[in-house]
């Protein structure tokens, strides 16, 4: 993907990218997270998928049981959205999610403290992009 280096921007639509290209962005973002945010004793896997019609729209999700970050290419419209989704879901990977659903039922998604933390971490997208874009 290095040949795209000069053509790839945060505003580049994911519709213009192949799945392997998006996978590379996800992989480099996770590597950046491991270096800058830390990691657990077990790693995290990732995949780029198309979310079927009828599901609640989301840029991505973290599957705690499979230890996998999924990015949904049909809902993450730009490179920026992909990076933000990975930062958000990587934060969940780092969190203790044992009481996540219990807290969710009490306060809802928008006020959930772990979701708030993940949304704050999304703001690192610019710093992350500055570091990873040279590797793409």
Model-derived regions: residue spans:
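Short active-site segment of divalent metal-dependent hydrolases/proteases
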Residues: 87-95
